[in-house]
Amino acid sequence: MQYLAILLPLLLSVVLATYIIPRILVVSVKKDLVVPSETRDKGRLRVPRLGGVSLFPILVISVGATMVCLVKFHILPLIAYEDSDTFVYYMFGIAGLTMMYLLGVMDDLLGVSLTSRLVIEVLAAALIPLSGLWLDDLHGILGIFEVPWWFGIPMTIFTIIYISNAITMLDDVDGLAAGTAMIAFAVLGFLALYVQEYLLLMICATMIGMLIPFFYRNVMERRIGWRNIYLGGTGGLVIGYVLSFVVIALSRMGGTSLPEGIIMVCFGTLIIPMFDVLRVAVTRMVNHRNIFQRDNNHIHHRLIQGGMSPMQVLATILVVSVFFILFNAVGVWGGWNLSILLVTDVSFWLILQVVISYYKNKNRDL
């Protein structure tokens, strides 16, 4: 019966998203809430950007309704209230997610200055470590084990902001943000099921369920231009914040309910966006440019510049993402040194960048 914690929120979120998305499309087109896209197919350069406004309400409804049903019929214990610390984690998490959601909506509709955006993101991210949920142990990565609060809390805040914005950067290619997030939530959901963290499991199942219709519309029906829709800044911030919360929660279980190095698997689900944002930021600094100024230097842009179609880019990035996840899982369960595992991840990433640069330059010279 525990699998109802997967099926109920998954099915409910699929139904809700399938119902809501077409109505968001209609409003976006009527109100001209669309943005140009250079990476999506020619002939479909203006795409509705408000898809992400549906995510937070669907998450709350699906998880809330599932909890009520499972607890009411005594299928699962009253998860959120068994442990006062757990209750605080989730309440602070909901508050922070609400702030991120409102920030995304304001940014998509009106635009928000960089300073205001950063202040709100810091406040929202700070709520998670203030609840007591923060990265207090790196389990030997680079020789670091227990982390003092004065370092761990700022590191956690930075990580949440980092992941939230990294996911947002993937929304230029049809299905890329949704596909990457679904893979990550599937892996994290499996880990949550393994340790019987049913509320985390419901969250992961709900996120997968609501992203399935987005992925279907943007990939399976990609030739029908008006049906495609951006997740937008709202979607990226919501997905990134939820991913951050789940990743941090599961990473803290390393050495107890999960293997010591599970932090590498959790963060390994997000290697592509995290490594890519770091590479882009370093490149901008080396070139004496503003690191917050958007450009066409992200991995999906580079693959397209190398001659790939958007669908080939999508398939390539998702396959590479799965490779990194499997590689880290094998390393963790095989008892590998986490520092060596991290260095190997970075080495694979650098080799990938060299290959992409080769084909990009080759295509430019044609």
What are these regions (language model features)?
Residues 1-277:
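"…together with the soluble PPM/PP2C metallo-phosphatase catalytic core" -> "…together
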